[in-house]
Amino acid sequence: MSEYLLEMRNIGKEFNGVKALDGIYLKVRAGECVELCGENGAGKSTLMKVPSGVYPHGTWTGEIFWEGKELKASGIRDTEAAGIVIIHQELMMVPHLSVAENIFLGCEPTTGGFIDYDQMNARAAELLARLKINDINVALPVYHYSGGKQQLIEIAKAINKNAKLLILDEPTSALTASETRVLIDLIKDFKKQGMACVYISHKLDEVAEISDTVTVIRDGAHIATRPMSELTTPDIITMMVGREMKNLFPREPHDIGEVMFEARNISCWDVTNPGRKVVDDVSFALRRGEILGIAGLVGAGRTELVSSLFGVWPGACQGQVFLEGKEIKIRTPRDAVRQGICMVPEDHKRDGILPIMPVGHNMTISVLDRFSLRGLIDKDAELVAIQREILRLKVKTADPMLAIASLSGGNQQKAVLSKMMLPDPKVLILDEPTRGVDVGAKYEIYKLIFALARQGVSILMVSSEMPEVLGISDRVLVIGEGKLRGDFPNENLTQEKVLAAAIGKPATNAA
């Protein structure tokens, strides 16, 4: 019997003549968790679509061996029958079907030729109980549940398919800390039962906790495979980016001027429960060239607050907004952009891009009037601007006219940043700007934020990553249960002090 459950040898893959994978090797033993590391666009997701059958045999080069025998899968049905199941970064749920229907989709139990819903619900509940998931009603539609709960439902679906190898692509990018904990504990249990796992994540603390082996790829090529016990986080980062990165937060001095933007008594109401406030009488000021971080627990009201300031919160809002001392009215994003306020949304795939449009057009869509002459677009001038932005943000794309959906998540995020920087904003709102982005791309985004601050742009940044908030902010607002719980200059500010304010413990207002 083979030592390895899965062995991939010399795997290559091309798209339109461009090499995405070039001679990659990967080995996974039963009961082992292999972490696949690399920058955005390195080829991690592309590589995992090979053994999972998304790319059938013949569309790639090399060899795959499964339980010692060569695997030539013609599609996902073949690989799932073998026991290889992938859970993509974008969850494959049917929102209006029940939890049980999603778990058994395509393999529904039947009686007399009809779907047996009682049996399906009972088996789904039993499956979730086996996974120690007791707070999900299998009869409810999936859309009732958070992204974290949906991730667990996807895992239950994989277990129902008798998975021997579970491939998880950025499983915790949109999860809360408690949801992440549940997922990590599940993976540890799976390993004890002999299930193997390939885990893709940019959160290197998770990598250290659950991985036995780390394989690093860069620009589609295999860089190294090492036992996790021999590596430190800086070692992994150096292999990923090809250079030593001593300081993740490249702080540079920048002048902070007069008040540029002011929000007074902002309140917002829940869309589904109009009697409940999600933002409750929040006021703050933002100065020219200042980086103002907004911290708080998930669900505290941070996204709701910044969405209202950009005119995208769908519920009722009230309060006043001032720009350079003058009151302004913002009812739509168009109003905000015209006033010099731009925003990079939390969910860039849903709210920030037009997936089937080219990368370049996604960048310039907010400033097309700049390239317009008598109603016609000057394509040459537009292309010059696009190429300049691609170089400035180091967006990895073979061609700016490729659909943006073909790019990795991190490169899509850079394109969204570019779109919101091209209008030359006075105020830039960033909601989770580095979510799902690798360490190298984070570093580039941080450098960009500091460069904008030096140019006098006022930056309002929401982040759930506390080191990020403390690493780049000049001042930190803390939101809890929709209220402003703290306003702290970032001098000797600690995670403990921010967390204490977020959960409602006494915290001194220091600004």
From Swiss-Prot:
By its UniProt entry, which Gene3D superfamilies does this protein fall under? P-loop containing nucleotide triphosphate hydrolases
Superkingdom of this protein's organism: Bacteria
Q: Which residues form the ABC transporter domain?
A: 6-244, 261-506
A Pfam cross-reference name: ABC_tran
Q: Which GO terms describe its molecular function?
A: ABC-type D-xylose transporter activity; ATP binding; ATP hydrolysis activity
Record GO cellular component, one term: plasma membrane
Q: Which sites bind ATP?
A: G38, E39, N40, G41, A42, G43, K44, S45
Compartments where found: Cell inner membrane
Q: Which residues form a coiled coil?
A: none
Catalytic reaction(s) noted = D-xylose(out) + ATP + H2O = D-xylose(in) + ADP + phosphate + H(+)
Membrane topology label: Peripheral membrane protein
- Give EC number(s), comma-separated: 7.5.2.10
Q: Which InterPro entries match?
A: AAA+_ATPase, ABC_carbohydrate_import_ATPase, ABC_transporter-like_ATP-bd, ABC_transporter-like_CS, ABC_transptr_XylG, P-loop_NTPase
What's in the keyword line of the UniProt record? Answer: ATP-binding, Cell inner membrane, Cell membrane, Membrane, Nucleotide-binding, Repeat, Sugar transport, Translocase, Transport
Give the first-level EC class, as a single word: translocase
Subunit info here reads:
The complex is composed of two ATP-binding proteins (XylG), two transmembrane proteins (XylH) and a solute-binding protein (XylF).
Family to which this protein belongs: Belongs to the ABC transporter superfamily. Xylose importer (TC 3.A.1.2.4) family.
Q: What does this protein do?
A: Part of the ABC transporter complex XylFGH involved in xylose import. Responsible for energy coupling to the transport system.
* Protein's recorded name: Xylose import ATP-binding protein XylG
What is the species listed in this Swiss-Prot or TrEMBL entry? Answer: Brucella suis biovar 1 (strain 1330)
